Amino acid sequence: MKKNIGKITQIISAVVDVKFTNKGKLPQILNALECYNDKQRIVLEIAQHIGDDTVRCIAMNSTEGLVRGMEVVDTGSPISIPVGIETLGRIMNVVGEPIDGKGKIKGSSISSIYKSAPSFTQQSTDRNILVTGIKVVDLLAPYTKGGKIGLFGGAGVGKTVLIMELINNVAKAHGGYTVFAGVGERTREGNDLYHEMIDSGVINLEEPEKSKVALVYGQMNEPPGARARVALTGLTVAESFRDMNEGQDVLFFVDNIFRFTQAGSEVSALLGRIPSAVGYQPTLATDMGELQERITSTKHGSITSVQAIYVPADDLTDPAPATSFAHLDATTVLSRQIAELGIYPAVDPLDSTSQVLDPMIVGEEHYNVARKVQQILQTYKSLQDIIAILGMDELSEEDKLTVSRARKIQRFLSQPFHVAEVFTGAEGKFVNLADTIAGFKGLTEGKYDDLPEAAFYMVGTIEEALEKAKTLK
């Protein structure tokens, strides 16, 4: 079949205009075009048709070195990437090219990054708890298998560390496969994650097919087109694992979903669309919906997704984080005030929510303990103004006891992480759900009122707190 060839007529940053002279052969919207610059393959994705013979494209690679008059070939289909077992243990970029220096991904099947979401009849409605081993999450905002989880937080409060710990705790204990999509984050973190996975055995370099994870990176230095599409590339790999054989349970980590929105905003501005609120693209809700609706569980397999969501200027009402709220089953909100107290993970126990914190799903005891913990912490929060102005002495005996318990609960919500051992020197802890419930139940009932607050800081189970208390007395 004769190739459909066009020529570059205009280049403005990441936006490239291509003119096709074949009448009636204008490529479709979202088709991938290819051109070669010094033997390097450059992929362009069609975003708009301008007139009868010109298309406006978004570049997936750097446009450095491109010149007007260069030949461009229509591939006849959207961006397509390798999927399946062969991607395990490998790192790909947005267009499916390996970037780990280990050669071509051989023998894999090819799939378009654009697909429709599963129909209602295919979707599963089962609700099972996913135990993470992180006390504050398991107790107050539990995650579901096949659910969508958002980690909200401003700059530097620990979203990536929490994602790394979840990969460590859940992906290692988890039988299925894991896909990690690095969207517009630091290259250093992506490199650290890759080497940590090799050290921990999640990636097997000798026999890549025995690895548990596939990585897809489109980092901060990439053009906006790549950052706006790399989440779809990662999701396509995750969907292929979910639908394999008789179905699989897949974990899909995205760090960071805000960068997906941010890249969409840059692309939108480059294409000349009129911005909406706070300068975001007018299609913000549509873009987010197209991605999130595909992250779902079917009757064959499930995708459990954990998404880090950067919150600009710590403002949860910003359109980017606010748009993603509607799609999530559980939200874990990281708070700068809690991080300032030195309590890590800096999860806000009152702002974090979960649809499965329901006595019908988690059981009466878990639900009652969680609500009691939140009640004590809420009372302490409302008393803080009085304490700041008048001091502790002006409180009633009952309020003093509540404050004392709240401070112990606050410290007991902290926990040493496996992935932070290098920085803290403290051994990481995985706490079972039964131990978490028992520990907090004892605290709310006043069993440990005589122990010092420091005993509860950075420990795993309540038994460890009791041991620590002996060394403090």
Swiss-Prot record:
UniProt KW keywords: ATP synthesis, ATP-binding, Cell inner membrane, Cell membrane, CF(1), Hydrogen ion transport, Ion transport, Membrane, Nucleotide-binding, Translocase, Transport
Binding positions for ATP per the UniProt entry: 153-160
Catalytic activity, as annotated: ATP + H2O + 4 H(+)(in) = ADP + phosphate + 5 H(+)(out)
Entry membrane topology: Peripheral membrane protein
CDD domains: ATP-synt_F1_beta_C, ATP-synt_F1_beta_N, F1-ATPase_beta_CD
Alphabetical list of InterPro entries matching this protein: AAA+_ATPase, ATP-synt_VA_C, ATP_synth_F1_bsu, ATPase_a/bsu_AS, ATPase_alpha/beta_chains, ATPase_F1/V1/A1_a/bsu_N, ATPase_F1/V1/A1_a/bsu_N_sf, ATPase_F1/V1/A1_a/bsu_nucl-bd
Pfam families linked: ATP-synt_ab, ATP-synt_ab_N, ATP-synt_VA_C
Domain of life: Bacteria
SUPFAM superfamilies: C-terminal domain of alpha and beta subunits of F1 ATP synthase (SSF47917), N-terminal domain of alpha and beta subunits of F1 ATP synthase (SSF50615), P-loop containing nucleoside triphosphate hydrolases (SSF52540)
E.C. code: 7.1.2.2
Enzyme class: translocase
Keyword Protein biosynthesis attributed: no
Alphabetized GO MF terms: ATP binding; ATP hydrolysis activity; proton-transporting ATP synthase activity, rotational mechanism
Keyword Glycoprotein included in the entry's annotation: no
UniProt cross-references to SMART domains, sorted A to Z: AAA
GO (cellular component) term, any one: plasma membrane
Localisation: Cell inner membrane
Complex and partners: F-type ATPases have 2 components, CF(1) - the catalytic core - and CF(0) - the membrane proton channel. CF(1) has five subunits: alpha(3), beta(3), gamma(1), delta(1), epsilon(1). CF(0) has three main subunits: a(1), b(2) and c(9-12). The alpha and beta chains form an alternating ring which encloses part of the gamma chain. CF(1) is attached to CF(0) by a central stalk formed by the gamma and epsilon chains, while a peripheral stalk is formed by the delta and b chains.
UniProt cross-references to NCBIfam families, sorted A to Z: atpD
Family from the record: Belongs to the ATPase alpha/beta chains family.
Function: Produces ATP from ADP in the presence of a proton gradient across the membrane. The catalytic sites are hosted primarily by the beta subunits.
Name recorded for this polypeptide: ATP synthase subunit beta
Organism: Rickettsia bellii (strain RML369-C)
